[in-house]
Amino acid sequence: MNREEIYRQFEELDKRASLGGGVDKIEKQHASGRMTARERIDMLLDKGSFNELDKFVNHRCTNFGMEKKQIAGDSMVSGYGKIDGRLVFVYAYDFTAHGGSLSETNAAKIVKVQQLALKNGAPVIALNDSGGARIQEGVNSLAGYASIFYQNTIASGVIPQISAILGPCAGGACYSPVLTDFIFMVKEQSHMFITGPDVVKTVTHEEVDKEELGGAYTHSSKSGVTHFMCNTEEETLMSIRELLSFLPSNNMEDAPFTPCSDDIHRRVETLQTVIPEDPNMPYDIKDIIEPVLDNQYFFEVMPHFAKNVVIGFGRLNGRSVGIVANQPAYLAGVLDIDASDKAARFIRFCDCFNIPLITFEDVPGFLPGTMQEHNGIIRHGAKIVYAYAEATVPKITLITRKAYGGAYIVMSSKPTGADVNLAYPQAEIAVMGAEGAVNILYRKSSAEEKQEIIKEYESKFSNPYRAAERGLIDEVIMPRDTRYKLVQALEMAHNKNQSNPPKKHGNMPL
């Protein structure tokens, strides 16, 4: 062949590879309401920045006639590109080719991208839409999953890993997303489960459809497996871009600085009255969080799961911060098993990637009851104090109202390593509430006597000043000054240099 023929051959092969399973399969994918792998990548990345790797890789399976079913790329599109000018690596299962099933060869494509991301200190994004393991390959496909899981684990805490479930994700395929830092799902399109509805019916005789078993709502509100539930694929991909704007590319960098035009001295007068005078009345903690952040913008994570704790990202004077807060508007803000898990994992993520932690505390205690005790609230609650105590990033705590007992301790208290502890004048820092304490200490007293003692207890302990006298509270502040006080504390601790004793790893109470 001459040069022109060689070039023409390449162009034809390249065009064919770009079609994945072919025009018919692409039309079928569109008819199901889903984009193709390449369309997803093009929407996710900066325009024209995608560089595809291993486009002509193909499987080597000869079982069950597979040697006659060769599709270039082998149902996987992988490579690298940029998001907001920053390097990222990405791989997307191509459902138009072999149903996006995982083979030995396309698993190797994923592992190559994972290793490149790790070497170059860049995030890796997985776009999942797969029928699962390629049955025709048997154990070779399973070994491919194992290699991916291994790379997920090695990269954990070194580079951000993000997964989007944009179709089916069943069986062993579920474990890679769960080993990553954040999972996105699409309403009524994404499904994750270890065993599908048919197997569930056979084994347990339960009648359940795939949406109830493993849909986006189930995993965002009940299991806590997924972090974000989006309405469309487009919203999902844009949300991934937004999430990355708060994160560094790796654990050796800081998150990108965003120039701030929002006055750091801005007072928020509404905070003077947002907390009810009755200490037992609820309020929405986000009415405190949002107004004090840059441009009053809060990017919430896991908004539908364990609503008694609020987590997410924001910025203070241009710097990314992780927010952890008790939510008095839900279960009075008590800590339970799910809330403990939710908070602890987020705290550890922020610590991995040098993101300072701001804690808004209003917690009356841990949720009582046999269900919580029997399911291990002691063990789960300990995860929060472990995560906070282990974290070496700047840690700033603001007590807005209640801070009682063991729950006060675990929510980034001064003795567990917080750098700056602030409190509002109405903060109550005590072993427990006045009524509970008096009922224990003076159980034989009359109701009238108890009321007098309750008033005495409240005057002595239902305020922040006893803790401030002992240095457990660094400063009592007016609510309106919250934004500037947080910015000041963050700037003071910006160059914090702390390291824990050398160890292989700790033994967190999992």
Language-model segment annotations:
Residues 1-510:
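Ligand-binding clefts of soluble mixed alpha/beta catalytic domains
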